[in-house]
C-alpha cells in the first residue's frame, strides 16, 4: 500500500539542496551542530516574523559559519547601513560560540507566491484572524496559479470552524505529480493557533520539471507569457480531495432498424 512521504525529503540530492550542509568530526559535534542550527532558525523566524522568511540554509566548517536567509522583505534583515545584519551576526555568534566566524547573507525572494512555506503561513494567518478556512485556501490557490505554478494542493485539518469533532478538508487544482522525482514540488506545513485549538495547514506547489540544470514547463517559462486563464476560476474548478462529484452518463441514442 502506497504511503505519503515528504516531497522535500524525497528530492534531496536530486533537485533540492539540504538546508544544513556540513560534515562533523564525530557524533558529539553532529548533535551540537544540529541543536545550534535549530536555535538559529527559531531565533530568525521568531524575531523577524514580519520579514516573510521562506527558509534558512546553513553551511559550516570547523572555523566558519555561513547563514543564507531567503526572505521577502530583505530590508528588515539588513537595516540601514547593514546595522540589523550586524546585530543578527552577533546573536548567531553567541549561539555557535565566539571562536566561529559568522557570515550572514540575505537573499530576496522574487516570487513569494511560489513558495509553499509563505503560502501555508498566509492561510494559517487568515484562519487565526477568523477568516473561513475555505475562503483562505481559495484565495491562495488563485494567487499561486496566477503567479505561474502548474498546480497546487492545500490541506487543512483540525477543529475546522470551531466544531466539536476534528476533520480535514482540502483542494487540488492543476497538475500535482508527487511521484515524479524531476518535478519541482515545494511543500510546507504550518500551524494556525486558534482559541479552539491548533489547525494544521499543508501546501504543495508544482513549479515545473527539472532536467539537469534546465527547467522545463516551469515558472521561468510561464512568467514570460500572458496567461489566457482569468484570475477567477470557473465554477466547480475547486475539487475537494476527499470526495468527487458523480457525472451523469450521456443518454443513449435510439437506433432504428
UniProtKB/Swiss-Prot annotation:
UniProt record similarity statement: Belongs to the universal ribosomal protein uS3 family.
Keyword Nucleotidyltransferase found: no
Origin superkingdom: Bacteria
CDD domains found in the cross-reference section: KH-II_30S_S3 (cd02412)
Residue ranges of domain KH type-2 in the record: 40-110
Region annotated Disordered, chain positions: 223-257
Keywords tagged on the record: Ribonucleoprotein, Ribosomal protein, RNA-binding, rRNA-binding
GO CC, alphabetical: cytosolic small ribosomal subunit
Subunit structure, as described in the record: Part of the 30S ribosomal subunit. Forms a tight complex with proteins S10 and S14.
GO biological process assignments: translation
Its job: Binds the lower part of the 30S subunit head. Binds mRNA in the 70S ribosome, positioning it for translation.
Compositionally skewed regions (Basic residues) per UniProt: 231-246
A molecular function (GO) term: rRNA binding
Protein name as annotated: Small ribosomal subunit protein uS3
Amino acid at each position: 500500500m502506497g504511503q505519503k512521504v515528504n516531497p522535500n525529503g524525497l528530492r534531496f540530492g536530486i533537485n533540492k539542496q539540504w538546508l544544513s550542509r556540513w560534515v562533523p568530526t564525530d557524533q558529539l559535534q553532529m548533535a551540537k551542530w544540529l541543536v545550534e542550527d535549530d536555535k538559529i532558525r527559531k531565533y530568525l523566524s521568531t524575531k523577524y516574523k514580519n520579514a516573510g522568511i521562506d527558509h534558512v540554509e546553513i553551511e559550516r566548517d570547523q572555523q566558519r559559519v555561513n547563514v543564507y536567509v531567503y526572505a521577502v522583505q530583505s530590508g528588515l534583515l539588513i537595516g540601514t547601513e547593514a546595522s540589523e545584519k550586524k546585530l543578527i551576526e552577533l546573536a548567531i555568534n553567541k549561539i555557535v560560540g565566539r571562536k566561529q566566524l559568522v557570515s550572514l547573507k540575505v537573499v530576496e525572494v522574487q516570487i513569494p507566491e511560489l513558495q509553499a512555506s509563505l503560502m501555508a503561513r498566509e492561510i494559517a494567518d487568515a484562519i487565526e484572524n477568523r477568516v473561513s478556512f475555505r475562503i483562505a485556501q481559495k484565495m491562495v490557490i488563485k494567487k499561486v496559479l496566477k503567479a505561474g505554478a502548474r498546480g497546487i494542493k492545500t490541506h487543512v485539518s483540525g477543529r475546522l470552524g470551531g466544531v466539536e469533532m476534528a476533520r480535514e478538508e482540502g483542494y487540488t487544482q492543476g497538475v500535482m505529480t508527487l511521484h515524479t522525482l524531476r518535478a519541482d514540488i515545494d511543500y510546507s506545513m504550518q500551524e494556525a493557533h486558534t482559541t479552539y485549538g491548533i489547525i494544521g495547514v499543508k501546501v504543495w506547489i508544482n513549479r515545473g520539471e527539472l532536467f539537469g540544470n534546465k527547467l522545463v514547463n516551469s515558472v521561468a517559462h510561464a512568467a514570460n507569457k500572458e496567461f489566457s486563464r482569468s484570475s477567477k476560476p470557473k465554477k466547480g474548478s475547486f475539487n475537494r480531495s476527499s470526495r468527487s462529484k458523480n457525472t451523469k452518463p450521456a443518454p443513449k441514442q435510439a437506433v432504428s432498424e
